[in-house]
A protein has these predicted regions:
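Active-site-proximal segment of zinc-dependent metalloprotease catalytic domains
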Residues: 73-160
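Intrinsically disordered, low-complexity boundary segments flanking structured domains
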Residues: 24-35, 77-85, 107-116, 184-195
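Sequence-level motif detector for i,i+2 pairs with an aromatic at +2
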Residues: 38-40, 90, 120-121, 198
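Acidic glycine-/aspartate-rich tracts in secreted/extracellular proteins
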Residues: 17-23, 48-50, 100-103, 130-132, ...
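Generic structural hydrophobic/aromatic packing signal, biased to beta-strands
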Residues: 15, 43-45, 95, 126, ...
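The catalytic-center signature of Zn2+-dependent metalloproteases
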Residues: 136-198
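Solvent-exposed, flexible loop/coil residues
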Residues: 7, 71, 111, 115, ...
C-alpha cells in the first residue's frame, strides 16, 4: 500500500490536465469536449505512514485500522482520520489514501456548500491503488481522483436525484448541457443512458 511521491505527483498531473481542458487521447479517442474549468493543482506536501505491512504498523499516532477497517464512507473512523490528519481545508485539498473494506474506489464526505471551508469534512478519500501506476487496473490511471475532485469542487453525478424533466436546470448534475440520467453507469459508456425525453 505504500505510495511513492512520484505517483502522488503523477496524480497531480492527471488532475491538472483533466481540469485544464487537456484534449489528449484516451484509449485512442481524442476528448474534443474537454473544457478548461480554471482549476490547477500543485503538490504541496505528503505525510507518509508505513502501511506496506498493515499488520505491523507501529506509528502510534495512526491506528493501523485507519488503513482498512475504519476507512469507509460515513463512519466514525472516517471522521477520526479527517480530524487527525487534515491540513487547513480552507487552503488545501486533503487527499487520504487507504484501502476501504467495502471495495469503494473513492468518495468525498460532503459537497463544498454543505460545511464551512475550514471544516475537516472537506477532502477526498481514494483507494491507494487507483493512483497512476497502481494495481487497481483498469482504475489505475488517476481518473478516480478526477471524479472525486469533481465532487469536491461541486459537480454532481448526471444521475443525481434520478431522471427529471430534461429542461429542469437542477436535474441530474445541474449542468444544463448534460442530460440527466435515470441511473448510474458502470462499465462501458452508454450514450443517453436512461435520459429523460424532452
Amino acid at each position: 500500500g505504500l505510495v511513492s511521491e512520484s505517483r502522488l505527483r503523477a496524480q497531480v498531473d492527471v488532475l491538472t490536465r483533466a481540469f485544464g481542458g487537456d484534449t489528449s487521447t484516451y484509449e485512442g479517442v481524442a476528448d474534443t469536449d474537454a473544457a478548461n474549468v480554471g482549476a490547477t493543482f500543485a503538490f504541496h506536501d505528503a505525510t507518509f505512514h508505513d502501511v506496506s505491512d498493515v499488520s505491523d504498523v507501529s506509528t502510534p499516532a495512526v491506528p493501523r485500522a485507519w488503513f482498512r477497517e475504519a476507512c469507509a464512507p460515513g463512519t466514525t473512523g472516517e471522521r477520526e482520520i479527517r480530524d487527525a490528519l487534515a491540513v487547513d481545508p480552507s487552503s488545501f485539498l486533503n487527499v487520504y489514501l487507504c484501502e476501504p473494506p467495502d471495495g469503494a474506489l473513492g468518495w468525498v464526505a460532503a459537497f463544498p456548500d454543505e460545511f464551512p471551508e475550514s471544516d475537516t469534512t472537506h477532502g477526498v478519500f481514494l483507494l491507494h491503488s487507483t493512483l497512476p501506476g497502481g494495481a487497481a487496473a483498469p482504475y489505475n490511471l488517476g481518473d478516480t481522483a478526477v471524479h472525486e475532485v469533481g465532487h469536491f469542487l461541486g459537480l454532481y453525478h448526471t444521475f443525481q436525484g434520478g431522471c427529471h424533466d430534461l429542461w429542469d436546470a437542477d436535474a441530474g448534475d445541474a449542468v444544463f448541457d448534460t442530460p440527466p440520467h435515470a441511473r448510474a453507469n458502470h462499465g462501458a459508456c452508454e450514450e443517453m443512458l436512461g435520459t429523460t425525453s424532452s
